[in-house]
Amino acid sequence: MEMYVEDVPMPDIGPDSVLNTPIRPKYEILKSKKKTQNENDPEPMDISMSPDEKNLKKSTVRRKLRKSKPNSSSNQVSSRTRALTKRSNSSNAIIKANNQDSVYVSDWTNVHRDIPIVVSGYLQLMFNACVASIFLYFLFKIVFGIQNDVRNRVEYHKILQEEQAADCQREYLSINCDSPGPAIFEVCQKLKQCKMESSNNVGSTKLAALVFAEIIDAFISHISYKTMVFSLILVFGSLLTSNYAFGLYRARHSQNIHDYAANAIPAMIPSSRFLPSNLSDISNRNLIEAASQEEEI
């Protein structure tokens, strides 16, 4: 490859400048020419080539450059497709996981469809137990209160009778009723009868009945009929309403389970044929009965 070399005359004026311009050495001029030639031409070309050959070579170089550009674009496209495939794979994995979770949830709900019925039964039992315990608490409190009142009243009557018997004994001795005269005979008989009565002969049953009657009388006199009726309606009405509500809920839930099973499970004919899913339950039952009758015949 022959390079073009230009002879630059060296001035005799001096090494500094010619007409106030800096003087460059010869090798710097050659270097700048090579640089400009490399910038203009993608490849160094032979000077001995004809203009047609030069144009042909330039066109081939341009074609090569054009062909090299799509490679980068294809790489970009391939990278984009890889990214898209990765995203699609990740999205498919997420969808599969969600589907598996939904299938698991649906299986669990299908297996445990009777959980609301069981829970409602336990809630009804707890509510009834709470109401019954409150009612029994007040009832036992009233009963124990009546027993304490009866016991205290019996003890009080025993003490009174003992004191009365002691008074009768003192009077009997004071008037000398051991040898009574006809004037004091009746009085001595009464004092003797009073003295003979002891505290063990107190009628506990009569006293208990008397105390119970007094308590009921006081209870009714202090509490109005409206309050009593309201309390009874509150207790028994809450029991009846709660039991009716829980029973109605269980009945409707069991009916919904029956309808769901009839619609979800396809009706199967004994001849291993399945009915279409768009038929109603009545038509399915009729067809099943007809098929079973045909097989029996």
UniProtKB/Swiss-Prot annotation:
One of its GO terms (biological process) is mitotic spindle pole body insertion into the nuclear envelope. It is found in: Endoplasmic reticulum membrane; Nucleus membrane. The keyword Transport applies. PANTHER family: NUCLEUS EXPORT PROTEIN BRL1, NUCLEUS EXPORT PROTEIN BRR6. GO terms for cellular component: mitotic spindle pole body; nuclear envelope; nuclear membrane; perinuclear endoplasmic reticulum membrane. It comes from Schizosaccharomyces pombe (strain 972 / ATCC 24843). Its main location: endoplasmic reticulum. The chain crosses the membrane at residues 126-146, 203-223, 228-248. Residues 70-79 have a biased composition (Low complexity). Involved in mRNA and protein export from nucleus. The modification Phosphoserine is found at residue 90. This is Nucleus export protein brr6. Residues 57-69 have a biased composition (Basic residues). Pfam families: Brr6_like_C_C.
